[in-house]
Amino acid sequence: MSRLSAILKNPNLIFRVSTETRPQPAHIPCVIAKSRRDTSPPRRCKRSGSASVLGIMLISVMAVILGMTIDLGYIHVSQSELRRTSDSAALAACWELFDAKVDGLSDQEAAQQVAVSADLFGSQNKVAQSYPHVYDQGDDITLGYYDVVTRQFDTNSPADINAVRVNVHRQGHTNGEVPLFFGTVLGRQTQPMTSTSIAALLNTVNGFYVPATDSQTLDILPFALDEDTWQSVVDGETDDSLSWSNGQVVATGNGKCECNLYPQGTGSPGNRGTVDIGSSNNSTNDIARQILSGISRDDLLDLNGPLEFNVNGELFLNGDTGISAGVKDELESIIGETRIIPVFREVNGNGNNAVYTIVKFVGVRILAVKLTGRMSGKCLTVEPAPMVARNAIVSVDGNSYSDYLYTPVMLVD
């Protein structure tokens, strides 16, 4: 009652009492919650040391991966450089093989020249900061025959050599292995490498494509030779009294028999071995142009397409009148040069209506020309000669429709 009496006498006491009796908010300490059974003192979170260790481990792993990536990239680049080297050596060696065929060198002499050329050009290419040599040891430089049908390189056909295989090494005592940047870390300080390339002169010509531009021509003479005469030449049954030496014709045999391309008994009067490759207007100007410059793009377009054998291995060309004395100067100007001529099996018809059945294209060298005087004294003397046939169509059926003709050197493996 005393408290109530006091309030009645002084009403301000109500606000003071209210304030004194109002509950205060509880103070909650910032500690980690504990189980009721956990009597240990509170623990605070401290993990900065673990993150540092993990970071160091990740950096180490990344450094190893980076080192592997750099070395693998270097190996890849070096392998590409080595392949470029073997390609260069094989191409150069195969062109040297062609030159050896032109010069009539023996297989042993050709092999020596090929080896020199392979090393000369191969050693010009840098591989992993050094210049590897191509050594003529073991089977690193091999002559052989490349079969375009089976795509196999055969070393058992020496008479048909048309390809060169070159191996280039960077291993051991042969040019040394390729050094690596992080070899110590990865446990391997060097990497051995080998690259093999095969270059070939394909000699199964099946015809000729139409040149892509007007500036390109085919080195074909529009004069055909009968098959029997050509076979006699190949078999060595004709005379061998002339040869081309040091830029001139000499009266000395060279192991290659000659024949007279001037028409001799083709069986078609008025068509002494001349064929139309292009326009059929019998123009002496056209023939003169073809002798000097070759068969043009327009000439083949006049024939409605490429000059190609059919499935029976035959190509039909219309006959033109005999070789005119009007092209004597043009023929004399190409003495010593090589040309392609068609070989026919038979001819049917007379005059401009004659049709020649062409069965082969062959490479020859012009040695003598005489188109004036008595008929028996006229001649257009040629001998077999290896030559490059550009725009050639390659036969892929295993049949050969050419002699002494080769495509430009190409990489086949």
Residue ranges and their predicted role:
Residues 3-19, 27-38, 42-120:
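Alpha-helical assembly-interface signal, strongest on the long, hydrophobic N-terminal helix that forms
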Residues 125-126:
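Long, low-complexity intrinsically disordered regions enriched in Ser/Thr/Pro/Gly
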Residues 129:
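Divalent cation-coordinating acidic motifs and surrounding scaffolds
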Residues 58, 102-119, 133-140, 145-167, ...:
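N-linked glycosylation sequons
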